[in-house]
Curated annotation (Swiss-Prot):
ATP binds at residues 105, 108, 110, 112, 168-171, 178, 180, 194, 234, 247, 249. InterPro entries: CDC123 (IPR009772). Coiled coil: none annotated. The gene is cdc123. The keyword Magnesium applies. Pfam families: D123. GO terms for biological process: eukaryotic translation initiation factor 2 complex assembly. Its main location: cytoplasm. The keyword Cell cycle does not apply. ATP-dependent protein-folding chaperone for the eIF2 complex. Binds to the gamma subunit of the eIF2 complex which allows the subunit to assemble with the alpha and beta subunits. This is Translation initiation factor eIF2 assembly protein.
């Protein structure tokens, strides 16, 4: 895998070409001070409130959200949330233009590993505060910032990256309708159920139709239109049978191979013994979770306990412990005022 392949999978690189097959999205350049804030290490504390203008139908998940502030300064008496007025306006305008709720991501990754920290246990965001909370809690987002080329073989200097905030119109996607597709030398060689921890009866019953429809979509719209010969793309097949392009990913270890192994994929799956799902060598191998497989825990469960909390419990970071105690004291003061 080369650095150029990673760069080609940035959302802003492929979306203009394939936008008519994808979910409506807005791309906003990420200011350097916002990037610095997102990378600033510390303990999450509550310091203010923010309203989301433009949410015409507000539900329990679209309410006033707490802004966030991180601090490592034990002498800080009053904690105030950072302000990015111009950026905040652009983000809120984009959220409103997309219907009031969005799914956020960076150039490559979304904060899927941080969904648990949101009040609604969802990646659905209605304010910039929602986005900050997810991004600052996500190892995936941190990886985009700090190690985007970690698995690349070429030793050339890392190219300069212009980071972007991607806001995608919020859609209620059914996990059992998401699939990951693996392309080698511009040939679709493998398709995997995205949510491999669950068994979905409709996938087993419709496997041939699913495989053929994905292959047709690839041949008509993706093949030879992406700048690399080897890549991975994710799709969603809706209830009407329409296929939506969700994302592109590099062909390599940085991308989860799901029900395949990278060793198999690099062999083009042609000589994989006993692969009953690849009887026709002209068709991609389609793997899905069968009924006999025990339901597995979510792969994101391991991200549910932030290192900051571990540091607090073990006393390894005294400054964070002081911030945590200050937060509790402030909450008690607020309760007594009420």
């Amino acid at each position: 895998m080369k650095k150029e392949q990673v760069l080609n999978c940035q959302f802003g690189q492929w979306y203009p070409t394939f936008k008519k097959f994808s979910i409506r999205s807005v791309i906003i350049p990420l200011p350097e001070n916002v990037k610095d804030y997102l990378l600033d290490d510390g303990t999450l504390v509550v310091s203010g409130r923010e309203e989301s203008p433009g949410c015409s139908q507000r539900d329990l998940n679209c309410t006033e959200e707490d802004e966030v502030q991180w601090s490592d300064d034990e002498s800080t008496a009053t904690l105030t949330a950072p302000e990015f007025p111009e950026f905040s306006i652009k983000v809120q305008e984009a959220i409103n233009s997309l219907g009031g709720s969005v799914f956020p991501k960076l150039n490559w990754s979304s904060p899927r590993d941080a969904y648990w920290i949101a009040l609604n246990s969802s990646l659905k965001c209605t304010t910039l505060s929602d986005i900050f909370l997810l991004f600052k809690s996500s190892d995936f987002v941190t990886h985009d910032f700090t190690q985007p080329f970690i698995y690349c073989a070429d030793d050339s200097p890392d190219p300069n990256i212009k980071y972007e905030l991607v806001l995608r119109k919020w859609c209620e996607l059914i996990p059992g309708a998401e699939f990951r597709c693996f392309v080698r030398e511009n040939k679709l060689i493998g398709i995997s159920q995205r949510d491999y921890t669950q068994y979905y009866d409709h996938i087993s019953k419709q496997k041939e139709e699913i495989r053929k429809s994905i292959q047709y979509f690839f041949q008509e719209h993706i093949q030879y239109n992406f700048p690399d010969e080897d890549f991975v793309f994710d799709i969603y097949k809706d209830s009407q049978g329409k296929i939506w392009l969700i994302d592109f990913n590099p062909f390599g270890e940085v991308t989860d191979s799901l029900l395949f192994t990278w060793e198999e994929l690099r062999r083009n799956l042609c000589d994989v013994p006993g692969d009953v799902e690849n009887e026709d060598q002209d068709c991609p191998t389609f793997r899905y979770t069968n009924r006999e497989v025990t339901v597995q825990p979510s792969p994101y469960l391991s991200y549910r306990l932030p290192k900051d909390f571990v540091d607090l419990s073990t006393g390894e970071d005294a400054h964070k412990l002081i911030d945590f105690l200050k937060l509790n004291r402030n909450r008690q003061d607020e309760d007594s005022d009420d």
